[in-house]
């Protein structure tokens, strides 16, 4: 416990908060170029082939980003937009690729939560067929 005199001399130091997505540098999103697109397996209780991409950002930092949704058109040298948000069962993956932006296509035939996957509104005639 400091004395009053020590507090007058030095004051209290403010603890700096640690960010969950440091590569974004306090920006909501950042643009980058895919250097490698591949699949990886999740941590212990889960089993799948998760689609991820290694992305070199505009600030020269290289990160691993998750590709959400079913199917994608990404390959090496694709320009992508990344946002924060980790994938709980993939260690080291702290970013998501934004679907429907830049070179990334939206998810095809997506009917629910479309805005999160960059999918356009389905045509009225097709919606009746899907409903049954």
Swiss-Prot record:
One Pfam family hit: Ribosom_S12_S23
PTM-bearing positions, type 3-methylthioaspartic acid: 89
Record's keyword annotation contains rRNA-binding: yes
CDD domains reported in the protein's UniProt record: Ribosomal_S12
Recorded GO MF terms: rRNA binding; structural constituent of ribosome; tRNA binding
Keywords of this entry: Methylation, Ribonucleoprotein, Ribosomal protein, RNA-binding, rRNA-binding, tRNA-binding
Record's subunit section: Part of the 30S ribosomal subunit. Contacts proteins S8 and S17. May interact with IF1 in the 30S initiation complex.
Protein name as catalogued: Small ribosomal subunit protein uS12
Species of the source: Chlorobium phaeovibrioides (strain DSM 265 / 1930) (Prosthecochloris vibrioformis (strain DSM 265))
Primary gene name: rpsL
